[in-house]
């Protein structure tokens, strides 16, 4: 006796829910399988989390270069510091601006590099 898949489906459709549940249990026992839906394994939490784009930047003066006077003038213009403070910052290097937008950080970097300084934006 050969049953087609269609005849099997029709026979199952005629059964009540309780009878179908008993059939499923019998199939699980007979073949050693489980009818439970497989659990989805997600990737690592870091991979699932969206990457946040940096919105605040820090502009740091690394080196004044050969045109120290031009760099001091640029530092004064950018920071609003007095002559002595701008000179000290230019000679020692350090943070010029903190928590600024990307556009402002790029503008400051461009001005100082035009004066001959080495600048880093983080």
From Swiss-Prot:
Protein name, entry field = Large ribosomal subunit protein bL12
Q: Name one GO cellular component term.
A: cytosolic large ribosomal subunit
* Molecular function via GO: mRNA binding; structural constituent of ribosome
- What family is this protein classified in? Belongs to the bacterial ribosomal protein bL12 family.
| Superkingdom field | Bacteria
Q: Please name the InterPro entries in this protein's record.
A: Ribosomal_bL12, Ribosomal_bL12_C, Ribosomal_bL12_C/ClpS-like, Ribosomal_bL12_oligo, Ribosomal_bL12_oligo_N_sf
Q: What is its biological role?
A: Forms part of the ribosomal stalk which helps the ribosome interact with GTP-bound translation factors. Is thus essential for accurate translation.
Q: Which Pfam families match?
A: Ribosomal_L12 (PF00542), Ribosomal_L12_N (PF16320)
Q: Which organism is it from?
A: Xylella fastidiosa (strain Temecula1 / ATCC 700964)
